[in-house]
Amino acid sequence: MAAVSETVLVSAPQDHDAQAASDPQATAADSPLEDFRVRCTLKRAVMEVMEMCGRFVQELGAVLPEDVRELALRDAQWTFESAVQENVSFNGQAWEEAKEHGLMDSDIKVLEDEFDELIVDVATKRRQYPRRILESVIKTLKAQHASLKQYHPVVHPLDLKCDPDPASRVEDLKCRGEAIAKEMSEAMKALPVLIEQGEGFSQVLKMRPVIQLQRINQEVFSSLYRKADFKPDTCVTHVETTPAETGARKASNIVLKRKKAPDCAQRKRYPLRLQRINLDM
């Protein structure tokens, strides 16, 4: 009886342990699975941490042999990044589902504050900068005027070299001076003649035209005023001539004058020219 009772006492705790072990499984089946991943808010910050840790992974390759270093580093880097991506969540989302540029409310608030400050700064500069620009422009113009007043053109001095033999130059100057003096004396001698010629020319210009010159002018330009109905027979006059029977006479300067014809309008328009008859024939 005692042995039986002992087995019961020993077995009883075993049944209790088995029941206690089966209870967590039942509760786990009844409740949803717990998320053991690290909760993060910004994917960008996690990527920066991964990049920083990747440098340490690259430094570990210094102790590896060269033939397997590149492959081992690539495998270690891929394993590290895969492990981080699988064990990180962003607001309950996996690595692939989360956005890289996710912003929190605090970040948005900070950005809004910075944007407001920029707006205020720009508005202030719009009021102040035109005045400052105008002042700087005025100062610049004044400085330019002052610099222009101080500007003086540079004059380079000429090097005057003395002729080692000035006698030849002096002789040349003497010859030229004599030639110029001779020309001036000749000009002064010819000056009275030129003055006399000029006075005569001025007297000729002041003279009035003679009647004979007027008649010549009329004869020259008479063809411009000649009419078609003009009959020259009406104005022709007889001229005295010597008869043919007369013998040879001595040369004389006697000029036979024409008889004056009665005045007519045609004679006034077209006067006859005076003709001289040579009697030395």
Swiss-Prot record:
Pfam name, any one: Mis14
Keywords: Cell cycle, Cell division, Centromere, Chromosome, Chromosome partition, Kinetochore, Mitosis, Nucleus
Origin superkingdom: Eukaryota
Annotated GO biological process: attachment of spindle microtubules to kinetochore; cell division; mitotic sister chromatid segregation
GO cellular component, one term: nucleus
Renumbered residue ranges of the record's region Disordered: 11-30
Location relative to the cell: Nucleus; Chromosome, Centromere, Kinetochore
Residue spans of biased composition, Low complexity class: 19-30
Function of the protein: Part of the MIS12 complex which is required for normal chromosome alignment and segregation and kinetochore formation during mitosis.
Known partners and oligomeric status: Component of the MIS12 complex composed of MIS12, DSN1, NSL1/DC8 and PMF1. Interacts with KNL1.
Protein name, per record: Kinetochore-associated protein NSL1 homolog
Organism: Mus musculus
Gene that specifies this protein: Nsl1
